[in-house]
A protein has these predicted regions:
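NAD(P)+-binding Rossmann beta1-loop-alpha1 motif at the extreme N-terminus of oxidoreductases
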Residues: 1-62
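Hydrophobic Val/Ile/Leu positions in short beta-strands of Rossmann-like dinucleotide-binding domains
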Residues: 9-10, 69, 143
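Internal alpha-helical scaffold of NAD(P)-dependent oxidoreductase catalytic cores
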Residues: 30, 44-45, 131-225, 279
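Short beta->alpha hinge that forms the Motif I/post-I loop of the SAM-binding pocket
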Residues: 37-38, 71, 171
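Rossmann-like NAD(P)(H) cofactor-binding subdomain of soluble oxidoreductases
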Residues: 55-131
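Interdomain hinge/lid region at the active-site interface
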Residues: 221-278
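NAD(P)-dependent dehydrogenase/reductase Rossmann-like domain
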Residues: 272-290
Length: 290
């Protein structure tokens, strides 16, 4: 592992910025400066990292070798441009954004001034600041860089803070982010739908979650052990047309749930075909029903 000697500035003291700052500190790397538009979040993070709160993104960036931007996506390019248009020289500095969907183009203002630019995105979900730092270790980071030297630096950086690297082409970052959204955010939406069905039959939300969480955990465990094809169970995996019809009939007065059920089940047919255990006629019957 190469030695990382750079000092860091973090612009954005939310969940991701705080987690990264803690990870840097635990790795023995120096957080030199910090900025956030939210003064309360800025003060809390500044106290946590033992640094003075900067007055602006440019003020934070001028004293560091590497600038990590962890703002909301629509602010990344604005922050980068503000720093790039400031009076001090940024040539040779490293600009990193941690957005999943944005490409290197969001950092073009800095690249035009001679800075190196990187996308380093943690494939992880951060529900709150308290657990965010712990979740970074062992996570995979989607990295994108414009040259081999920057790619090597990104890999080394990720390894230093306890993560693993997955190289993503710049033009593929939106699709890459879609995959992460489906895996994490869609899971929450699906479970919300499942809980809402329980509530319709009089089961309280807490009781519904108590019943469903073990099922969800075992399903994820099955995916890890057997893969996304072998892990599928239930009526669609069995070719149980009668049960699927009964489900759809029961959702006749619930158009949104019925649309969701059909859409997800249609994708499940792809799994059934790939699995190759059902007769084609059985899959065709389910396809017509859906």
């Amino acid at each position: 592992m190469m030695v990382i000697e750079e000092t860091f500035a973090i612009v954005g003291a939310g969940k991701v910025g705080t987690a990264v700052g803690i990870a840097l500190k635990e790795a023995g790397l120096r957080v030199q400066a910090l900025y956030d538009i939210d003064h309360r979040a800025l003060r809390e993070a500044a106290d946590l990292f033992g640094v003075e709160a900067s007055r602006s993104p440019a003020d934070a960036a001028k004293s560091a070798d590497a600038i990590i931007i962890t703002t909301p996506d629509d602010m990344v390019e604005k922050v980068c441009e503000e720093v790039a248009l400031s009076k001090f020289d940024i040539a040779g500095k490293i600009f990193i954004h941690m957005s999943g969907a944005l490409t290197l183009e969001a950092l073009l203002p800095a690249a035009r001034k001679g800075a190196k630019t990187l996308c380093i995105h943690p494939i992880q979900t951060f529900a709150d600041k308290k657990t965010a730092a712990r979740m970074l270790k062992g996570s995979v980071f989607g990295i994108t860089a414009s040259d081999e030297s920057s790619t090597n630096w990104a890999r080394n950086f990720v390894e230093k803070i306890g993560g693993k690297s997955l190289q993503i082409r710049n033009e593929d970052r939106v699709l890459y982010h879609i995959a992460a959204v489906i895996a994490s955010n869609f899971l929450v939406m699906i479970e919300h739908a499942a809980v809402s069905v329980f509530e319709k039959i009089g089961v309280k939300r807490d009781d519904a979650l108590e019943a469903l969480i073990p099922l969800v955990r075992q399903t994820v465990d099955n995916i890890q052990r057997f893969g996304v094809v072998r892990a599928l169970t239930g009526p669609l995996a069995r070719g149980d047309v009668g049960t699927i019809k009964a489900h759809l009939d029961s959702l006749e007065n619930e158009p949104e749930l019925k649309t969701l059920y059909r859409a997800v089940s249609k994708w499940g047919l792809n799994i059934a075909r790939e699995r190759g255990e059902l007769e084609i006629t059985s899959i065709d019957k389910m396809a017509r029903l859906l």
